[in-house]
Every structure is written in C-alpha cells, then in structure tokens.
Amino acid sequence: MLDSKLLRTQLQDVADRLASRGFTLDVARIESLEAQRKVVQTRTEQLQAERNARSKSIGQAKQRGEDIAPLMADVERMGNELSEGKVELDAIQAELDALVLNIPNLPHESVPVGADEEGNVEVRRWGTPTAFGFEVKDHVALGEKFGWLDFETAAKLSGARFALLRGPIARLHRALAQFMINLHINEHGYEETYTPYLVQAPALQGTGQLPKFEEDLFKISREGEADLYLIPTAEVSLTNIVSGEILDAKQLPLKFVAHTPCFRSEAGASGRDTRGMIRQHQFDKVEMVQIVAPDDSMAALESLTGNAERVLQLLELPYRTLALCTGDMGFSAVKTYDLEVWIPSQDKYREISSCSNCGDFQARRMQARWRNPETGKPELVHTLNGSGLAVGRTLVAVLENYQQADGSIRVPEVLKPYMGGLEVIG
C-alpha cells in the first residue's frame, strides 16, 4: 500500500510514475474524496469544540439557577450531528482505503520502462543449451512413456491442470525440493519454516493478493467462521509472520524458506500452456522471503536473486536473468528479476523464478515495523520474496535437458544423493 501522505502531497507525480506501469490513477476521484474528507473533518472538529464549550456552559448556567433546557437540547443536537459526521467521515475514508488498496507499488528508478514483457531487459545468461543429436521429446512424452507422469488419472480425480507423478519421477520431484531447501538453509542462511497452507483474508491483503486478485484464489467459505484461502505462494504465510510486529534491529535481516504446495485458479490463463506441467492449479514451490532494514533492501534483492540462480547453476541448467520492465512487474514489487530456464522442446527460455523487492508496500499493509536505533522510533521494514525454485517447472527442465536418445533421463550430479545413487531414470 502506498503512503497516504505521498498521495496527498505528490498525487500527480505518483500518477505519472504509475502510468509507466500501465496503471491509470483516478486523480480526480482521489482529489474529490480528499476535499470531502477535509470539509467533513473540519466541520466535525469545529462542532466538537462548540459542543465542548456548550457543555461547559451548562454547569455555569446551572450554578446561576438559569434554565438549562435549551442548552441541553443544543448539546444533544450537536451530538447527533457529530455522530452523522463520523458516519460520513468513515464512509469517505472507506472509499479512499478501497482505492488505495488497489493501487500498485511505485517502480524503482532503476527499473526499465516498458509496456509489457517485450520491454524486459536481459541482464545475464548462464550455461549453453545442449545441442541434441536426436529429436527432442517434451516432458510429457518422456514422463508418459513409462507411466510415471499421468495426466489422465489426474484429470479423472481433479479435472484439468493437475498432474499425478509416480515412481522415479515422483522421487525426482521430491529430491529437487529437498536439494533446494538444504541449499538455502545450509549455504544461504535461511531458516526452514513450515507454514499453514490455508490463510485468512487479512494475510492475503497484507501481501497484496487481496482485494485485487481474488479471482485467482481458491476460497473456502465456512458458515459462522472466517473464510479461508489456499495459499497461492508461501510468500503469503512467510511474509505475514511479521504482520503487526515491531522488530528489534538486531533481529534483521530475517530470512525464511519453505517448501509448500501452491494453489492458483489461473483465471486469466485460458488456452495457455494447456499441455504438461508448466501451468497447474496445484504445484510445489520452494519460497524465500527476507525482512530487512530499508537501506539494505536493494542489496538484498541482488543476494536473493543470486540464491535462486545458484540452484540452477548446481543443477547445470542453462538460464537467463531478466530485469522486468515497469509494465510487466507484479502488483507489490518496486523491482523484480525473473529467471528463465531453457526448455529444449519449446526452444526457448521459460520463467522458473521471480525475485522481488517490495519496499515498504507490504509492510504498510501488514503494519510490520522495526525500531530504528538511530531514531528510537518504529519504522516500516522492507520485504522481499523469490522462488527458489518452482519445483514442477524445475522437474520439467531436468527431464528435458537431461534426456537421452532412448528416452531415459540422466540424474543431475547434485541430486544423486537424494536418489539413492541412481544415475539414470528409465
């Protein structure tokens, strides 16, 4: 959530910066609501002062033996007007709050300006795609050959965009997640965390999924109790660990990592990636979250992105790193890097990780703060998140990049300890 003071004092500048994201800020509506709020607030404050004075005069008139009925009637009338003013003020503030909750974050000055993914800037590449001496198969053909990747049974159970993994491929999927978690806790300094997979609405509002992206979520309604939502990413539960907290400076940075299933309705993805495991309603992901002091967040973004890249390097999977442009960034981000892994069957790079610095945007929504030792006052922290990595898409990349002419799959060197020393699948 943007700073309301910024919206009041630099509204047009905010609108111009948001325009670079393709977002049109309703400046006129915000100005109108702010003007109404000021009028009602001023009138209410004046009325309260007048009522206080009139209440004081009642006691004085009573001491003088005067009729206080007219004064009492005035005080009662003013009380009613104050109540009406409060209702009016609350309604104006509620509309302002609703507007602000749907405004995306402001892009950092270093973010390239662009309308869509065509404006993204490649920062670096690592590895060289293999030149196969045979016809490349996609992960579906490779997995279905031995019955280890079963979309037909998954569809019978759950419908479209689900996968059933069996045997060595299920084991390889588990091995990838274990490898990622171990790398992040042992080498990158993250704290392993197990979180709920169901959260209430305030948690999703805190990280920015609600109210704007409710159609992308799976919701569980419960009579007489708060609705629950299946997490679309562990970013939600991990980041909200510090919701409503005031952290000591010595606690920062906090670095959390979790392996969880993620659930997304993919409401806007009709017709896209309908084959295979690239876009699923349910998928596993290893998620990294950092909570840092504001001055440290841009450096933390580089570090967090490097942590995700290290996974791909150790798996020896070719990838590229992109700086997302203003028009392609996520709602809560001030700056984002995407990692794209090489998928041989598609002859192109596909997203496998998104690493973002959200500045104080999520912290303001969550009221997550730290006590600045220089001022002694609570101030908003900065939050970062990144996939380290999406397990299903990493499995796809391993299956395709490590395939052999007979359809078997070589096991990456770093995964062999997790596969009982198995060297080849199939």
Swiss-Prot record:
SUPFAM superfamilies: Class II aaRS and biotin synthetases (SSF55681), tRNA-binding arm (SSF46589). Its EC number is 6.1.1.11. One of its GO terms (molecular function) is serine-tRNA ligase activity. It is an enzyme of class 6 (ligase). Its main location: cytoplasm. GO terms for biological process: selenocysteine biosynthetic process; seryl-tRNA aminoacylation. Keywords: Aminoacyl-tRNA synthetase, ATP-binding, Cytoplasm, Ligase, Nucleotide-binding, Protein biosynthesis. L-serine binds at T233, A234, E235, E287, S387. It catalyses: tRNA(Ser) + L-serine + ATP = L-seryl-tRNA(Ser) + AMP + diphosphate + H(+); tRNA(Sec) + L-serine + ATP = L-seryl-tRNA(Sec) + AMP + diphosphate + H(+). ATP binds at R264, S265, E266, E351, I352, S353, S354. Disulfide bonds: none annotated. GO terms for cellular component: cytoplasm. Catalyzes the attachment of serine to tRNA(Ser). Is also able to aminoacylate tRNA(Sec) with serine, to form the misacylated tRNA L-seryl-tRNA(Sec), which will be further converted into selenocysteinyl-tRNA(Sec). Homodimer. The tRNA molecule binds across the dimer. Consists of two distinct domains, a catalytic core and a N-terminal extension that is involved in tRNA binding. This is Serine--tRNA ligase.
